[in-house]
C-alpha cells in the first residue's frame, strides 16, 4: 500500500483492550514503538490517547451515560488509576513529531 493511503498506529481504542498491541502499560516499549512509527516515513501516523482502565468495559474516568467531564492530561507518561494518558503531550513523542515534521519528504530505504 502506498504511504499516501496508509494510516499507521501502535494501538487504538480496540486493540489496547484486547491484548493484541502495546499500550501505555507497556512503558518504554510503547514509547519506543511510537517513536519508531514517527521516525519512519510511511503513512499518516496516529497517536492514541486514552485513559487508565481496570476492566475492558470501563468507561472514561468520571463519565456518565450522557457526558464525559473535562480532563487533565499528565505529561510524564505515568498512567495511574482514574487518569488519562495523553501520549501526544509526552516529551519524547512531542520531540519525535517535531523530528518527523523537520525531515518530511526525505527518502528512507
Put a short name on every predicted segment.
Residues 1-109:
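Active-site-proximal substrate-binding groove within the catalytic cores of carbohydrate-active enzymes
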Amino acid at each position: 500500500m502506498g504511504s499516501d493511503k496508509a494510516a499507521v498506529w501502535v494501538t487504538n481504542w480496540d486493540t489496547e483492550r484486547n491484548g493484541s498491541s502495546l499500550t501505555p502499560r507497556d512503558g518504554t516499549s510503547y514509547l519506543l514503538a511510537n517513536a519508531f512509527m514517527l521516525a519512519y516515513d510511511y503513512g499518516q501516523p496516529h497517536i492514541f490517547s486514552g485513559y487508565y482502565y481496570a476492566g475492558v468495559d470501563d468507561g472514561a474516568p468520571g463519565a456518565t451515560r450522557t457526558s464525559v467531564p473535562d480532563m487533565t492530561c499528565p505529561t510524564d507518561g505515568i498512567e495511574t488509576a482514574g487518569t488519562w494518558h495523553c501520549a501526544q503531550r509526552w516529551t519524547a513523542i512531542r520531540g519525535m513529531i517535531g523530528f518527523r515534521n523537520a525531515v518530511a519528504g526525505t527518502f528512507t530505504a
